[in-house]
């Protein structure tokens, strides 16, 4: 999967033909699970962009990782949920992933943002003023999970419940 390289200036907050997940929003605005039906996302204005990234249209369960930050929040991610008919693309300074195996909604979003997983990313980060992580470095990480979709669902629902209590 591919991300686009559109800056904020190339996007619109009002109208467009596709939604765009920007790394700054992943780092600050969005939680572990991004319900695209509830969040207002910046819009892509240029229709030619869609043809170039057609194979990378996001789906429910995809994960968007912010690959750049000014600190060790690099690697924060949002799992895509609530997607219906909209076209959504992964934006500048993000790495989109589509799981090969089926996961329960929310499980990957919460797990990949856990300290247990993030500890693997810290030695892979590069940079001094601006920190980043590469796709190739991400391949050196391990995802630990139960094969039971029911158990994954319970874990995801538990953390979602806690999120709602806090907010």
Features from the language model and the residues they span:
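Short, recurring structural edge motifs at helix starts
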Residues: 46-49, 128-130, 139-149, 165
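Non-catalytic DNA-recognition/assembly elements of restriction-modification systems
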Residues: 1-11, 15-19, 149
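Specificity-determining recognition surfaces
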Residues: 11, 32, 76, 91, ...
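A short beta-sheet element
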Residues: 22-26, 39-113
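Generic structural signal for secondary-structure transition and capping sites
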Residues: 2-6, 117, 164
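Amphipathic alpha-helical segments
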Residues: 108, 142-167
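A generic structural signal for alpha-helix starts
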Residues: 103, 116, 147-150
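Short beta-strand/loop turn elements enriched in aromatics
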Residues: 15-36
């Amino acid at each position: 999967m591919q991300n686009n390289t559109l800056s904020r200036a190339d996007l619109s907050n009002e109208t467009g033909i596709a939604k765009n997940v920007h790394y700054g929003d992943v780092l600050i605005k969005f939680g572990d699970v991004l319900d695209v039906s509830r969040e207002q996302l910046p819009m892509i204005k240029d229709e030619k962009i869609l043809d170039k990234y057609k194979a990378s249209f996001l789906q429910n369960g995809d994960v968007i990782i912010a690959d750049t930050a000014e600190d060790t929040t690099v690697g924060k991610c949002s799992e895509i949920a609530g997607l219906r008919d909209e076209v959504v693309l992964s934006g500048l300074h993000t790495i989109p992933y589509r799981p090969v195996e089926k996961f329960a909604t929310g499980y990957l979003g919460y797990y990949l943002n856990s300290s247990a997983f993030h500890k693997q990313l810290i030695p892979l980060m590069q940079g001094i003023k601006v920190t980043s992580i590469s796709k190739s470095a991400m391949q050196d990480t391990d995802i630990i999970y139960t094969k039971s979709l029911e158990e994954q669902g319970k874990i995801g629902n538990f953390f979602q419940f806690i999120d709602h209590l806090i907010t």
